[in-house]
């Protein structure tokens, strides 16, 4: 399954108006699921509930099903909570770090900044949105007028609050990762245990 590129507000409505900050900052006027028009909703099966949680993660972070499987395999090999390890790996993607630093209003916008060569990690240009950042990494905007103007405009209206595990100098457009993100500061409104259960039979 490829990355979703369709109408974003339709996705928000599908989940009953749930906030997916990585996907979009807009809010639908109508939070009823598309096509429901007030009809009574059927009770969801356990599989449907787990599938929905998995879809929330995929759509919030903009990852494909193949990428999700790869992250899940890595998370299962890690120590501690598999669900937390999964979310931390997604939060440490370069596109998500750029978003959480306030350099872009959404993760799709951050992905474009990275892929178009506007972002550097530890002084080197990185154009891979899925690049896995590490604690101590320094993320900066390339020293080009076009890059700095674009990010400076975004930084005036960040999509989310700056989490404690990051620091950001708005004047220098420079951020640093201080530590791994704790669960309470991860921007995914999901039950990660259900996501782990969904993939338990696939791995």
UniProtKB/Swiss-Prot annotation:
GO molecular function, one term: rRNA binding
Domain S4 RNA-binding, chain residue ranges per copy: 92-155
Key word Ribosomal protein present: yes
GO cellular component: small ribosomal subunit
GO BP term, pick one: ribosomal small subunit biogenesis
Gene3D superfamilies named among the record's database cross-references: Ribosomal Protein S4 Delta 41, Chain A, domain 1, RNA-binding S4 domain
Family named by the database record: Belongs to the universal ribosomal protein uS4 family.
Protein name from the UniProt record: Small ribosomal subunit protein uS4
